[in-house]
Amino acid sequence: MTSRLRIAVQSKGRLAEGGMDLLKRCGLRFAYGRDKLHQRAENMPVDLMLVRDDDIPNFVGSGACDYGIVGENVLAEEQAAGGRARELEVALRLGFAGCTLKLAAPDDGSIRTVADLEGKAVATSYPALTAQYIADRGVKAEIVEMRGSVEVAPRLRIADAICDLVSSGATLQANGLKAFETVLRSEAVLIRRKSGRADDTDAIANILMRRSEGVIASSQTKYIMLNAPTDRLGAIRALLPGADAPTIAKVAGREDVVAVHAVCRERVFWETLEALEKEGARAILVLPIEKMLA
C-alpha cells in the first residue's frame, strides 16, 4: 500500500488561499467533505491537514505532517523559541504572502536605532524572535508579549516601541509610529524536517516539488511575441528582460522582418514595450504562462 504524503496548511486567511491555489495549480484535486481538519486528494496520495498557522511547525517537527506551508515569520519565531522547530528547514520559497517584521517607535520620540531600546519595553507578537534580534546586538530590553493590536502599545504606555508585521505601513502611520529597523523579510515557505521520511512518499514529494517550482517560475515569467526588423534585431533582443535565447522565425512574404518569441524571466513593464516599439518592433504580445518545466 502506497504511503500518503501529509501537508499542513493554514485553515483560513491569506496563506490558506495561496497554499491551496499553489497545490491546485500543481494538479491536485481535493474532495471536500465534512471534516474541516483533513482533506484528501483524489488523484494523488496526498492528504492536507488544515490547522492554525502557528501550529504548522509543530505538526511538521513532530512528524504528524511531512511538509507544511507557513509564513517564514512563524517559522522564525518557533525556531527562536527552540524545540522541534529547530529540526525544520525551508524546502522551497513560494513567492506569495510577503511581509516584513519591523521595529517601530513613536514618530515624535527619541528611539531611532536598536541601541536606543536599551532599558526600554518592546511590545510584540513575536517575543522569541524579537528578544533574540535585540540581544544579538548587545542591547537589553524588556519584551512585552501581545497577541494583537500591538500598534497601540506605545499610545497606551504598555511599551516604548513595538516589533510587528508591516505591509503598507498605513497602520503604523495611523498610530503615530515610524519603522526604524527591519528584523525579517518574510514570505510563504514550504518546510520539512531535516531528517526527512524514508519511504515511498519521496517520489510524490519530488513530483510536487518539481511542479511547485514550475508554478512559481511561470508566475514570474512572461511569453513575449513580436515582429522585428532584421536590421534592428540585436537592439530588440537586448531589450527583452531576463530572456533566454529567443526563437527567431521567418515571416511569410517578408525578408526584412522576423518573428521573435521569448520567455522572459523578469517583469515586463509598459516602458519595456514602448522601448521595443521605438526600436521598430510591431505586433507585440505579452502572454502569461500557466505551466512551466525548465
Swiss-Prot record:
Q: Name one GO biological process term.
A: L-histidine biosynthetic process
How would you summarize its activity regulation? Feedback inhibited by histidine.
List cofactor names only.
Mg(2+)
- The source's domain of life comes to Bacteria
Catalysed reaction(s)? 1-(5-phospho-beta-D-ribosyl)-ATP + diphosphate = 5-phospho-alpha-D-ribose 1-diphosphate + ATP
**Mostly located where?**
cytoplasm
| Keyword annotations from UniProtKB, A to Z | Amino-acid biosynthesis, ATP-binding, Cytoplasm, Glycosyltransferase, Histidine biosynthesis, Magnesium, Metal-binding, Nucleotide-binding, Transferase
Gene Ontology MF terms: ATP binding; ATP phosphoribosyltransferase activity; magnesium ion binding
Q: Where in the cell is it found?
A: Cytoplasm
The protein's Enzyme Commission number? 2.4.2.17
The metabolic or biological pathway listed in the UniProt record of this protein is: Amino-acid biosynthesis; L-histidine biosynthesis; L-histidine from 5-phospho-alpha-D-ribose 1-diphosphate: step 1/9
GO CC terms of this entry: cytoplasm
What the protein does?
Catalyzes the condensation of ATP and 5-phosphoribose 1-diphosphate to form N'-(5'-phosphoribosyl)-ATP (PR-ATP). Has a crucial role in the pathway because the rate of histidine biosynthesis seems to be controlled primarily by regulation of HisG enzymatic activity.
By sequence similarity, the record places it as follows: Belongs to the ATP phosphoribosyltransferase family. Long subfamily.
Question: Which protein, by its recorded name, is this?
Answer: ATP phosphoribosyltransferase
Q: What is the lineage of its organism?
A: Bacteria, Pseudomonadati, Pseudomonadota, Alphaproteobacteria, Maricaulales
